């Protein structure tokens, strides 16, 4: 922990095509080994496909897909007197976006389609229609929080 106070958060510049910070964050998370050009190509190609399949503007469809994956509750482990409880907590807005992006990319990578852009567009289309692995993960997270509602008074 630094003595001079909290470290300021770095400002992420919006992406060049859609001028969106959300898209820039997604591209940065998608990137492997600093290969941003490759990540951008994948992202823009899958957004193009998403726009064609949904019949909506690609960025709006992408934002709706991310919105449908954002969790509002999560559980955090809390030790109380030798026992560990799963305590339901509200998720901060920036963490909601981070988790949604992470889940979308992870579930896209584990899909069976050929090529990452096809996998990513398929996962985004599923998220847009409120189904798929990332949406299931969100629902599981909410279910866990609901099941452990009895421990909500342990919040800190």
From Swiss-Prot:
InterPro entries, A to Z: Ribosomal_uS7, Ribosomal_uS7_bac/org-type, Ribosomal_uS7_CS, Ribosomal_uS7_dom, Ribosomal_uS7_dom_sf
Example GO biological process: translation
A cellular component annotation (GO) from this entry: small ribosomal subunit
Family matches, as PANTHER family: RIBOSOMAL PROTEIN S7 (PTHR11205)
UniProt subunit comment: Part of the 30S ribosomal subunit. Contacts proteins S9 and S11.
UniProt cross-references to HAMAP family, sorted A to Z: Ribosomal_uS7_B
Function: One of the primary rRNA binding proteins, it binds directly to 16S rRNA where it nucleates assembly of the head domain of the 30S subunit. Is located at the subunit interface close to the decoding center, probably blocks exit of the E-site tRNA.
Protein name from the UniProt record: Small ribosomal subunit protein uS7
Organism this protein belongs to: Nitratidesulfovibrio vulgaris (strain DSM 19637 / Miyazaki F) (Desulfovibrio vulgaris)
